[in-house]
UniProtKB/Swiss-Prot annotation:
Belongs to the class-II pyridoxal-phosphate-dependent aminotransferase family. BioF subfamily. It holds the Pfam family Aminotran_1_2. Its cofactor is pyridoxal 5'-phosphate. This is 8-amino-7-oxononanoate synthase. It catalyses: 6-carboxyhexanoyl-[ACP] + L-alanine + H(+) = (8S)-8-amino-7-oxononanoate + holo-[ACP] + CO2. NCBIfam families: bioF. CDD domains: KBL_like. The keyword Transferase applies. One of its GO terms (biological process) is biotin biosynthetic process. It comes from Hahella chejuensis (strain KCTC 2396).
Length: 396
């Protein structure tokens, strides 16, 4: 038997556990309604929170930049891949977030790995929320530092963890908005603990940037926290802002350290300049069109009231991420598939992405969703209320 025969066995086991992942291929732009294999579906599973992924103004900006800069970045930022569009976006992001400087990364995953590897090493500690995104946990494990975890959103437990590190350097990392639960980290309390214990705080605001704050400045803006209180701020441009890529914002010393030592920044090709140009327009739209966040709040408020009234168990979330807890992985998949037959796309989230017995439907809203869209979702959820097994779905 081949030494690699375990691959097939592992895949078979994953299927038997109802944890097998598969991809959908869409044939349309990202929007509330998408086309898959010739059928239109109403999607409540995108991270396009502000509804900008298919905005004609972003498309026009990208097209103009394509004619000016071409398509590819061509090289890493430190060789000849740092285009004017990148530089101007970094300036905009620094100003928007109230930080000295900002640095672009190709993805949020690479930004997180880059920060941890540049700031930490053997003898250091990285302390993370138990429910942090996988990229943050990977960043901690790969940094060379010792990884500790504290109870979810528990600043008191974080303080106890920091007491364990003694005089060693410690980087505390938390999501701003937790991607699978939608709740907001208590950044004010966490920042106070970090300050009192001389630890550096990093916030991954991938799902808060654009959604929270009057102009969409994210969790730091929501809590009115400056660069001293949140020294390392990471945000993404492919969710609320409808583009792609990510950034880290902070002091000049921090950013220059990343330029010199963050391997995921140094050893990769820059994002296409056209994406950076489109993201600049997206930032402006977010700041000016505050109705987009107001619309999200309207959708979330009504959804929560009516879904809870039907008997569904929701997470304690005020953000566009509204998980509907099912529990069993197979039951979550069955309900997701039943909704798809009704023309509604909602992804079933199962272990290991979430803890065992907490499988859920991850409902997400976009400012582009209409009242009729929400009505359709609620009607179908009403039909399947209480359906948590095969018989329940079949007989709903």
């Amino acid at each position: 038997m081949s030494k690699w025969g375990h691959l097939a066995q592992t895949l078979t086991a994953r299927k038997q556990q109802d944890l097998y992942r598969s991809r959908l291929t869409i044939d349309s732009p990202q929007a509330p309604r998408v086309m898959i294999e010739g059928r239109e579906y109403l999607a409540f599973c995108s991270n396009d929170y502000l509804g900008l992924a298919n905005d004609p103004r972003l498309i026009a900006a990208a097209q103009q930049a394509l004619s000016e800069f071409g398509l590819g970045g061509g090289a890493s930022h430190l060789v000849i891949g740092h285009h004017r569009a990148h530089h101007e976006l970094e300036l905009d992001l620094a100003e928007f977030t109230g930080r000295d400087r900002a640095l672009l990364f190709s993805t949020g995953y690479m930004a997180n790995l880059g920060v941890a590897s540049a700031l930490l090493g053997r003898g250091d500690y990285v302390i993370e929320d138990k429910l942090n995104h996988a990229s943050l946990l990977d960043a901690g494990m790969l940094s060379g530092a010792r990884l500790l975890r504290y109870r979810h959103a528990d600043a008191e437990h974080l303080a106890l963890r920091l007491d364990e590190v003694g005089d060693s350097r410690a980087l505390v990392i938390t999501d701003g908005v937790f991607s699978m639960d939608g709740d907001i980290a208590p950044l004010d309390a966490i920042a106070q603990v970090c300050h009192s214990k001389d630890a550096m705080l990093m916030v991954d605001d991938a799902h808060g940037f654009g959604v929270l704050g009057t102009e969409g400045g994210g969790c730091a803006a929501h809590f009115q926290m400056n660069q001293v209180q949140v020294p390392v701020l990471m945000g993404t441009l492919g969710k609320s802002y409808g583009a792609a890529g990510a950034f880290v914002a902070g002091s000049g010393e921090l950013i220059e350290t990343l330029v010199q030592f963050a391997r995921t920044y140094i050893y990769t090709t820059s994002m296409p300049p056209a994406i950076a140009a489109a993201a600049r327009v997206s930032l402006r739209i977010s700041r000016e069109e505050t109705w987009r966040r107001e619309r999200l709040n309207e959708l979330v408020t009504r959804f929560r009231k009516e879904a809870i009234g039907m008997g569904y168990q929701l997470a304690a979330s005020s953000t566009p991420i509204q998980p509907v807890f099912i529990g069993d992985a197979a039951a979550a998949m069955e309900l997701s598939q039943a909704l798809r037959k009704e023309g509604i796309l909602i992804t079933a989230i199962r272990p290991p992405t979430v803890p065992a017995n907490t499988s859920r439907l991850r409902v997400t809203f976009s400012a582009a969703h209409t009242d009729d869209d929400l009505n359709q979702l609620l009607e179908v959820l009403h039909k399947y209320r209480g359906a948590t097994n095969i018989a329940g779905v079949a007989n709903a």
